Amino acid sequence: MDSIQIVGGEKLKGTIPISGAKNAALPLMIAALLTEETLTLENIPHLADVELLIRILNNHGVGYAVDGQEFDDDGVNSRTIHFTAQKIATTRAPYELVKKMRASFWVIGPLLARCFEAYVSLPGGCAIGTRPVDFILEGLKAFGAHIAIENGYVHAKAPKGLKGAHYHFPKVTVGGTHVLLMAATMAKGTTVLENAACEPEVTNLIRTLNAMGAQITGEGTTTLTIEGVKKLQGTRIRVIADRIEAGTYAMAVAMAGGDVFLKNANPNHLTTVLKVLQKTGLEIQIEPHGIHVKRNPRNTTIMPVDIKTGPYPAFPTDLQAQFMALMTRAEGVAHITETIFENRFMHVQELNRLGAEIKLDGQTATVYGKEKLQGAPVMATDLRASVSLVIAALAAKGETIVNRVYHLDRGFERLEEKLARCGAKIQRLTA
């Protein structure tokens, strides 16, 4: 099993190209099930979750072709994938595939919309708490679907097709919004989704579906209205830049020090995060094709900042672990409150192994900043926790080995290469 070795103490300097967003790419890929025509997606990242979803879609009969240079001289991904679901081979999504990634459950929406039936295993993925599958099933019931749980599978049927409905999400859910949006595109009549997620990744999906012939209004708001259509067509669209990856590398610079240009990062998707990082002392400059981040070598103090995660545009839960790593070196005490997932502090124990002092009280972590961290062997517990350990290790004295980095490969494209290009002493160790 691979691990990552980091020797801390090196400043970062250079350019880091920001990849296409995994959280945007996955629902766009799943949307290919909605049409018999070809859906072409540009800027698809090379990630384990993407490759797994390709296998899942292929199981349903979706053909695909890859073109474009893998990486240019600057390390920028130019991969384009053409997906064609001319015929749906099966409406069954098996446990052996779905158990590996929760987002694979989202196929239930398009399969039900197009084939009037879906038989999908209950999902897997990172073990970071309850995810709102129930909201999805309740929404599909509102659309007229019959739902049964059988031997660990959800069997959904709508023999006469789905019907538009008014549905209020009990809690904001990005995945639930994705699924019900896709399901509603071909439902008969009008659908209104209230308390919907308005993340940039949701907007990317809405624009894709509209380009395919859907009629969705309310983009960027919490109320979405969908007028059902009979058929969707193919289109070509670009996956947005990964705001979580951009925020992660900005925090790495804040932690290790240095001067880095985050190429292709979209500052409009990071407004709250950038404001928080500026409060910590990071210098940020918005440029036409990205974000320039710098920690002034004459002022190396990291200021403590309290944050609370929340639905967009609040501070994203997917950057909570990375920010906690940064706060371990702050000059003072920071409080981090997690409101999205109830079990997303599994990285605390491992950060403490590096010399951090973090105490938990329910959904709030109190981080007591330390002058120094010490390298140690640590173990990744989930995707975002794994990269928080890398960030901490960049500033720790000595060597850190991060084990179980298969979590990292699910969501970060060539992380060790991107950091090494900027001067970090980091390498992958293959067992």
From Swiss-Prot:
Its main location: cytoplasm. It catalyses: phosphoenolpyruvate + UDP-N-acetyl-alpha-D-glucosamine = UDP-N-acetyl-3-O-(1-carboxyvinyl)-alpha-D-glucosamine + phosphate. InterPro entries: Enolpyruvate_Tfrase_dom, Enolpyruvate_Tfrase_sf, MurA_subfamily, RNA3'P_cycl/enolpyr_Trfase_a/b, UDP_GlcNAc_COvinyl_MurA. It comes from the Bacteria. The keyword Cell division applies. Keywords: Cell cycle, Cell division, Cell shape, Cell wall biogenesis/degradation, Cytoplasm, Peptidoglycan synthesis, Pyruvate, Transferase. UDP-N-acetyl-alpha-D-glucosamine binds at R102, D318, I340. Phosphoenolpyruvate binds at K22, N23. GO terms for molecular function: UDP-N-acetylglucosamine 1-carboxyvinyltransferase activity. Pathway: Cell wall biogenesis; peptidoglycan biosynthesis. GO terms for cellular component: cytoplasm. The active site is at C126. One of its GO terms (biological process) is cell division. It is found in: Cytoplasm. It holds the Pfam family EPSP_synthase. The modification 2-(S-cysteinyl)pyruvic acid O-phosphothioketal is found at C126. The keyword Repeat does not apply. NCBIfam families: murA, PRK09369.1. Belongs to the EPSP synthase family. MurA subfamily. Cell wall formation. Adds enolpyruvyl to UDP-N-acetylglucosamine. This is UDP-N-acetylglucosamine 1-carboxyvinyltransferase. The gene is murA.
